Design a protein with these regions (language model features):
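Conserved beta-strand hairpin/beta-sheet module of binuclear metal-dependent hydrolase folds
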Residues: 1-43, 126-143, 160
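Structured catalytic core of nucleotide-sugar glycosyltransferases
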Residues: 5-15, 56-66, 84-88, 113-116
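Active-site neighborhood of phospho(di)ester-bond hydrolases with catalytic His/Asp-centered motifs
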Residues: 26-30, 51-58, 78-81, 139-142, ...
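Active-site glycine- and acidic-residue-rich loops that bind
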Residues: 140-152
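Active-site metal-binding motif and surrounding structural segment of the metallo-beta-lactamase
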Residues: 33-79
Length: 185
């Protein structure tokens, strides 16, 4: 039996668990490690069943638990080259856990994970499809401003799809972004 659990979604943090009761992966870990752990436990999942963390992009609401959770549980991190470079520049990759560049696909335990580019104001934002050995296939794409042809191609054939986006005019108007960016958004 597969599990697809949105642990959190939104500007305060994003994280999704895909797998079974015994083994799975996280896509993003956007709150602190304690909150990620508690959310997993609330779903009846042990944090030790997480075999890898896949990062969609480097924004804080997607990586809050990255260092502490991955170090504590000894799990690897997968992300695009651009995201890994941004994470390294920001001091988020400290050598306490394995890091892998995600360019096309990865196999982690019984999971086959493929990536596709998404359009977002980040170094190299990605969405992921996850296929289990039993044929169940799920996709996660976050912070979508537009669904591109590449996103469409990435989600075709999935049993479950999580498309996440939000648009808060007040947050945008009062935020730190320069006017041309605010206008484009």
């Amino acid at each position: 039996m597969y599990r697809f659990c949105t642990l959190f979604s939104g500007s305060s943090g994003n994280s999704t668990y895909i797998g079974t009761d015994e083994h799975g992966i996280l896509i993003d870990a956007g709150k602190n490690a304690k909150q990620v752990t508690l959310s997993l436990l609330e779903e009846g999942l042990s944090p030790d069943c997480v075999e890898a963390l896949f990062i969609t992009h480097e924004h804080s609401d997607h990586i809050g638990a990255l260092r502490v959770f991955c170090k504590k549980h000894g799990i690897p991190v997968y992300a695009s080259r651009g995201t890994l470079e941004a994470l390294d520049k920001g001091g988020h990759l400290n050598g306490d856990f394995p890091v892998y560049e995600m360019s096309e696909f990865a196999d982690v335990g019984e999971f086959h994970i493929e990536c596709f580019h998404t359009m977002h104001d980040a170094a190299e934002s990605m969405g992921y499809t996850v296929e289990l050995e039993n044929g169940f296939k799920a996709a996660v794409a976050t912070d979508l401003g537009v669904i591109t042809d590449e996103v469409r191609a990435g989600i075709i054939g999935c049993n479950t799809v999580l498309l996440e986006s939000n648009h808060d005019i007040g947050m945008l108007s009062n935020g730190p972004y320069p006017y041309p960016l605010k206008r484009r958004i």
